[in-house]
Design a protein with these regions (language model features):
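Short helix-capping segments at alpha-helix termini
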Residues: 36-39, 65-69, 127-131, 159-160
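Alpha-helical elements of Rossmann-like donor-binding domains used by nucleotide-donor carbohydrate transfer enzymes
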Residues: 28-32, 56, 60, 77, ...
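Helix-loop "lid/cap" segments that line or gate small-molecule binding pockets
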Residues: 33-34, 53-67, 122, 155
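Active-site neighborhood of HAD-like aspartate-dependent phosphohydrolases
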Residues: 2-47, 180-181, 191, 195
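Metal-dependent phosphoesterase signature
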Residues: 60-100
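Short beta->alpha linker loops
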Residues: 25, 49-53, 77, 90-94, ...
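Asp-based, Mg2+/Mn2+-dependent phosphohydrolase catalytic module
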Residues: 1-9, 97-100, 106-107, 115-205
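Structured helix-beta-strand junction loops
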Residues: 52, 104-105
C-alpha cells in the first residue's frame, strides 16, 4: 500500500538508487576506476557514500587509503565509465508510481548528488525529466549531502517551505540531508518505504 501525502505540498526525489536503479552501473564504474588507479574497492563502503558527488568520493578514498589521487582526473574517469555503461538502470517501481500518482497535484523535484549533465541525460533517457518542476544536482550547490543545501534549493525552486516537503532517499547521507533541511523522509528499501519523520532526527543520527 502506498503512503499518503496529503500533508505535503512538495515531493523531492533522490535519483540514484531511489528513482532509478543505477547503483549496479555505478559500482561497476567504480570497480573499473579502482583497477585503473590502484586502490581497494569496497561496494558496501561506496554505498554508504551514496548521494556524494564523485569528486568528493575521491577525496574520501584519499583520506581512507592515504593516497593523493587527483579528484578531477579520477572522477572524470569514473563518470566516463558510467556514461559508457550499456545499461544504466531502470526506474524503481515504487517511487516511480509515487511520482506518477502525485505529479499533477503536488510540486515534484529531483535532489541528486549527480552532476547536472549526467542527471539530465539519465532522467530524459527514462522519460521522466519533463515530469519535474525542478531538478537540483551537485552542479548547483557547494555543500552536498549530508548538508541540507540540495533539498533546500529544491524546495525553494518549487516554492514550498521545507516543512511542506517530503524527501525520498535510499542512503543514510540522504536521510541526514533531509532531516537537516527540516523535512520528513521516506527511505526506499528492498521491502518498501520506511518513514523517517524529521522529529526522529535528534534521536537517531
Amino acid at each position: 500500500m502506498q503512503p499518503k501525502f496529503e500533508k505535503y505540498q512538495g515531493l523531492i526525489f533522490d535519483m540514484d538508487g531511489t528513482l532509478i536503479d543505477t547503483m549496479p552501473a555505478h559500482v561497476a564504474a567504480w570497480q573499473k576506476t579502482a583497477d585503473e588507479f590502484g586502490f581497494d574497492f569496497d561496494p558496501t563502503w561506496l554505498h554508504s557514500l551514496g548521494g556524494m558527488p564523485s569528486h568528493k568520493i575521491v577525496l574520501e578514498v584519499n583520506r581512507r587509503f592515504g593516497l593523493e589521487l587527483d579528484p578531477v582526473l579520477v572522477s572524470g574517469f569514473k563518470m566516463q565509465q558510467f556514461a559508457q555503461s550499456e545499461v544504466k538502470g531502470e526506474l524503481i517501481a515504487i517511487t516511480h508510481q509515487v511520482l506518477l500518482d502525485n505529479m499533477d497535484d503536488k510540486k515534484v523535484a529531483i535532489g541528486t548528488g549527480a552532476q547536472q549533465q549526467g542527471a539530465h541525460e539519465l532522467l530524459k533517457s527514462r522519460g521522466v525529466f519533463d515530469y519535474f518542476d525542478a531538478v537540483v544536482t551537485a552542479t548547483e550547490v557547494n555543500n552536498h549531502k549530508p548538508f541540507p543545501d540540495t533539498f533546500l534549493l529544491a524546495a525553494e525552486q518549487i516554492k514550498c517551505e521545507p516543512s511542506q516537503c517530503v524527501v525520498f532517499e535510499d542512503t543514510l547521507l540522504g536521510l541526514q540531508a533531509a532531516h537537516a533541511a527540516g523535512m520528513d523522509c521516506y527511505l526506499v528499501t528492498k521491502s518498501g518505504f520506511v518513514f523517517k519523520p524529521v522529529t526522529e532526527a535528534a534521536f537517531t543520527e
